[in-house]
């Protein structure tokens, strides 16, 4: 089993982190700067930022002083929102025993356990904010390393 983001989801998280580093509702960040800072493909970065804007997480401003910024403070943006903006709803859609849609949820021995695991993952993403990621990122940059379990308090 591989629980991983698609490339689009990965890029969306990195782009949101870049905007969050600027303090959220602060100054606008140029598309080019997001791409360079977060090692994103320059040709794909505008699409990723548009996904965040369409989800109401970021806003764009045209012009010399334009770019993108978060619409809310980083502490109010859950990682789950960013992931779902890029990936769609984080749900249990495939039967792990038979593949395809799950039609046996009321009689399946695995369904309850699998649903609980998915919900635990959703809860973790819901409780982790962009401010948490900025704090963890700063700790890593300062040589503190990656937290062993969870994120440090913001």
Show the residue positions of the predicted features:
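N-terminal helix-turn-helix DNA-binding core of bacterial DNA-binding proteins
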Residues: 3, 7-40
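Alpha-helical residues within the helix-turn-helix
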Residues: 36, 53-54
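Basic amphipathic alpha-helical segments that dock to polyanions
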Residues: 45-53
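Conserved segment of winged-helix/HTH DNA-binding domains
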Residues: 74-99, 110-119
């Amino acid at each position: 089993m591989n629980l991983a983001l698609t490339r689009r989801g990965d890029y969306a998280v990195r782009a949101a982190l870049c905007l969050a580093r600027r303090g959220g509702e602060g100054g606008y960040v140029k598309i080019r700067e997001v791409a360079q800072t977060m090692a994103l493909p320059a040709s794909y970065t505008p699409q990723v930022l548009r996904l965040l804007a369409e989800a109401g997480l970021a806003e764009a401003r045209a012009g010399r002083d334009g770019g993108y910024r978060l619409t809310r403070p980083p502490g109010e943006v859950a990682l789950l929102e960013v992931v779902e903006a890029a990936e769609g709803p984080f749900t249990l859609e495939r039967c792990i025993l038979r593949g395809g849609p799950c039609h046996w949820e009321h009689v399946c021995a695995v369904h309850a356990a699998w649903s609980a695991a998915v919900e635990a993952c959703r809860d973790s993403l819901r409780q982790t904010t962009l401010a948490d990621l900025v704090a963890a990122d700063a700790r890593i940059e300062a040589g503190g390393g990656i937290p062993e379990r969870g994120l440090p308090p913001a």
